[in-house]
Amino acid sequence: MKYDLIIIGSGSVGAAAGYYATRAGLKVLMTDAHMPPHQQGSHHGDTRLIRHAYGEGEKYVPLVLRAQALWDELSAHNEEPIFVRSGVVNLGPADSAFLANVARSAQQRQLNVERLDATALMTRWPEIRVPDNYIGLFEADSGFLRSELAITTWLRLAREAGCAQLFNCPVTRIHHDDNGVTIETGEGRYHASRALLSAGTWVKALAPELPVQPIRKVFAWFQADGRYSVKNRFPAFTGEMPNGDQYYGFPAENNELKIGKHNGGQLIQSQEERKPFAAVASDGAEAFPFLRNVLPGIGGCLHGAACTYDNSPDEDFIIDTLPGHENTLVITGLSGHGFKFAPVLGEIAADFALEKTPSFDLTPFRLSRFSQ
């Protein structure tokens, strides 16, 4: 049997692509080295932020707004909502370049973003402490996503629509010829007209020419109380420290508040190097500078987890065909800020398989930018 699309890596982007391509009427085979959702990549840990006024650059805003519409649609398929509109407050010095990008994106796209000075911030959320030179940009329409629930839902919907799924089965090689793409696995060879390579952190095992660096990252849950919950209207947040360190976190659930540090981490080259949480001496204390200064009412570390970022050299996404192979789309280099975009990236992959022109300007995400 020849498929229209083979998906190599069915985590966040791959799971979404499998659903949207199958829903469009294509014959699709989803593959993964593990059983998604799993803890070997970048999508585990219960929750991920979604922000609309994007501090990483205005080029992302059309993508994230389409993603939000698709998240709302996906949530309708579940009794438990996948998207929680908690709001997101972005904290940092008034002269922060990141916050300037947030404000610029909000102005250009007429997004619902409120600017709060330090006094107004601490009045609205007495649990937060910031210096006088800090501001907050509050996105009331943003919030957080239940990442593993999202992947489970996409996989179920794709399967119900007739998608073939081959999990716990690593792809060992990819072959290209005039007839399409062939993959080799322990279960045999499979053929398709087109392929999506969305293998996340370890994409270089199949495409070593891609400029992707795996980074070991950690996040942790700390003791909290009801003041920090969604019921008390406590928001999700990003926070920039005076030294430039970037943190992110979520409202407390079951008296546990999850927080992580976006920058830093350990460069790794193999799955074995991604040691579990607490294997590196700094893991448990990584969030202390932020908690001590900004959220002093939070208690001790309860537990944590390790994950991996697939960083591109400029930490912008890679969305392009594999060099020399126009029938294979690569989506990688999501650099720790990609999950919120998973549905729109999956939709882009489905359009690729349908040979449709993308609805977005993907020029900023082409591989050619690294050779200029």
From Swiss-Prot:
Disulphide bridges: none
The keyword Flavoprotein is annotated on this UniProt entry: yes
Cofactor(s) in the UniProt record: FAD
EC annotation from Swiss-Prot or TrEMBL: 1.5.3.-
Annotated InterPro entries: FAD-dep_OxRdtase, FAD/NAD-bd_sf, Me_Trp_Oxase_MTOX, MTOX
Binding-site residues, FAD: 4-34
Enzyme class: oxidoreductase
GO cellular component: cytosol
Family: Belongs to the MSOX/MTOX family. MTOX subfamily.
Protein name: N-methyl-L-tryptophan oxidase
Biological source species: Salmonella arizonae (strain ATCC BAA-731 / CDC346-86 / RSK2980)
Taxonomy of the source species: Bacteria, Pseudomonadati, Pseudomonadota, Gammaproteobacteria, Enterobacterales
Gene: solA
